[in-house]
């Protein structure tokens, strides 16, 4: 329910600032306490805040519903202070988690005896078992090859750790010490996030805080909706793009997306995309993912507004086809889904480029995923997991940005690579004009 309580602009800014500060603190906690390189060096982690309805208040969930799959097993009325839930199952979460290495922790926030919000911590984990070290392989053909599936479980019950379930999950990793260190870092971040939200509710009061958070979502939705109607003209635009084969056969895959506007109704249709892949490049798109891609573009017009559930207001309907590469059937493998959703983001920009006459950043290359797996002399696995950012497409006013991801991740520092792994880096540099010299 949306609050009707009026909040003055200064208080709203203070509440907004409290959310920003809390997220920064909790993410720094993960970075400084996690053990695996993919989290502490590559920074593939995040903390998000959700309202009592499960809608994003502030963060980067890409339009995903992070709470419903927990509610399916643990209804909100059964939750208690001190509970913490854990899952990574892409299919049970309906694509809110996109592949098994992405572990999610969810904590309800209780204030004055009721749930007023949820805290969500997430990170990409080093290894969860499966067919290969790192739990990712392009030639994997089913989700069981991608590592241990954790359905939504209550890992902490009113402050008490479910040690039996925890030990089972740790036992299924080739690197249980790293997995334990990383999971405890995320648990700590979720706990700290709860503390900060409770302080915020105590400082401003429940009604004022809820009203402020509701107003922020409404403001973002209003801005995004107005911009989408201003920028997207009447008619239809479509894009088809292709991906390399999945490593199982020589078959190439494509997806097709069509953006349509009829009066004030905007729809996105991807039902003409190819059938699901035989390997692991399938992307199980959540209901809100494609809407969020558009919302992120429109958010640039007023970055003073929080990126939240309001970003989904850009699109009225999204149509996907069950059994396609964007909505694969169980138990299709999903480990290398980043190749698909990164290109899908570029296709969203291509649709907007058609709609705006080219006033959009050009398509970007998919980042390089490198896995070095080897047995050490003692018989233990040595694993180096690296995603190498290749940069962004050209912008209407400047060349593209070099060597960065489409999201929040970073490349490994050269010094770290040489200290952590048995290698010597002879050169670490940007290939001059490898994507073209550009206009600027």
Predicted regions and their residues:
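Glycine/proline-enriched, intrinsically flexible loops and inter-domain linkers
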Residues: 1-81, 86, 90-111, 115-440
